[in-house]
Every structure is written in structure tokens, then in C-alpha cells.
Amino acid sequence: VVIIVIAVIAMYNSLVQARIKVDNAWSQIDVQLQRRFDLIPNFVETVKGYMTHESETFEKIAELRTSWANTESVAEKASLDNELSNALKTIMAVSEGYPDLKANQNFSELSEELRNTENKISFSRQFYNDTVTMYNTKLEVFPSNIIAGIFNFKSRDLFEAESADALSLIHI
């Protein structure tokens, strides 16, 4: 009986530790995504003067920033991240036609910061998905699946991103 109690406690603690790792990995993504959202207003202001025909894209970015602040779930944040990446791709593609903009030092610095942030997001997303996969596996394998069911541990969603990141076009 004592051995069974010790085994249950050990499995429970293992599941709690795995859940904490998932939460930590998510907060790392959240920090990087927030950093990107913080960079975007300066970036938009820099390009606005050059790109007068992209007002819809700028409005979309503003809407996404507002939605981001009110979103909690991983799936919703992943969807917003994909939309933002697409908007950034549009801006970066259009910027190719503006040599004066590309020569602007502020634009170059912000593009570099965005590229670095995109790299960090990519690495954080990979780490999060690896951590979630390990956690979800623990929830499925015997005998920890019994403990997970008793103590109501829930599986977590992966952070699904589109195949091409905004990073692919941020190469000024």
C-alpha cells in the first residue's frame, strides 16, 4: 500500500512539473510575441509616410494588436500571430518598391529587430511544442494516464503556425 501511495505521489508530481514547464514555455512565446507587438507601432509609423496606399494593412495591424490584448487561448493567439505575420509580409513586400524607405536607418533597425524577434518566436514556439508534446504524452501513457484522469489534468494545444513566417520577408 505504501509503495502504491508513493508511486501515485511521484506520478502526480511528475505531471505537475510537466504542466509547469508547459506554462513556462508558453510565457516565453508570449514575451516574444508581445515584444513584436511593441515594435510594430514604431515600424508602422516609419513606413506610413512612404506607403500611403497600405492604410487597410495598417488598420488590420491595429485591430490585431487590440485583439491580442483580449485573447488568452493558445489557438486564438496562434491565429492572431498568423494574421500579423501575413500583414507584416505585405508591408515588407511593398517596401521593396520604396528605395528611400529601405535606405531609412530607422526602418533598417526596426526590420532587424523584427527579424531577431521572429527568430526568437520561432525557437520559443519549437520549445513550447516540444514541451507540450512531452506533457501530452505523459497524460496518455499508462499508468500516469490514470493519475491524470483522477486529478483532471488536461491536454494542451500545440502552437500551430503557418508554414512561412514573416521572417522570410524581413531581410532588408
Protein language model regions, located:
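A helix-centric hydrophobic-segment signal that preferentially recognizes long
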Residues: 1-170
